């Protein structure tokens, strides 16, 4: 599945670059559910924590946040290491130029997600 996502994102970003629109677009990809560590008979069950991917020429390359520890679980789930609202606050304020507090109902520390 990740190979298909990668190919689709590359094609999309290549098309944006060809149209000279890539600098205006941010791709944010996430799932509403994570995966549990323990396998069952058909794979793994839905969990509570999962990754968020950002793509586009304005995004700083690299990983942000701390990887969850596979042996330090909370009721069988990975522990969240970065609150998704920190990602949203960063996108709202640093990419869209909007205040994040009204949308997120609180203040969340932004993450260094974007190039200068």
Regions found by a protein language model. Give the residues of each.
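Feature marks hydrolase-like catalytic cores characterized by long aromatic- and Gly/Pro-rich stretches
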Residues: 1-116
């Amino acid at each position: 599945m990740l190979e298909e996502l990668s190919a689709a994102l590359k094609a999309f970003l290549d098309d944006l670059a060809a149209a000279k629109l890539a600098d205006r677009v941010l791709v944010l990809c996430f799932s509403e559910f994570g995966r549990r560590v323990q396998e069952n008979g058909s794979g793994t069950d839905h969990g509570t924590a999962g990754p968020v991917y950002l793509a586009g020429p304005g995004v700083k390359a690299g990983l942000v946040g701390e990887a969850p520890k596979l042996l330090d679980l909370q009721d069988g789930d990975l522990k969240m290491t970065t609150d998704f609202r920190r990602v949203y606050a960063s996108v709202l304020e640093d990419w869209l130029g909007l205040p994040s507090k009204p949308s997120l109902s609180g203040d969340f520390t932004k993450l260094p997600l974007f190039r200068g």
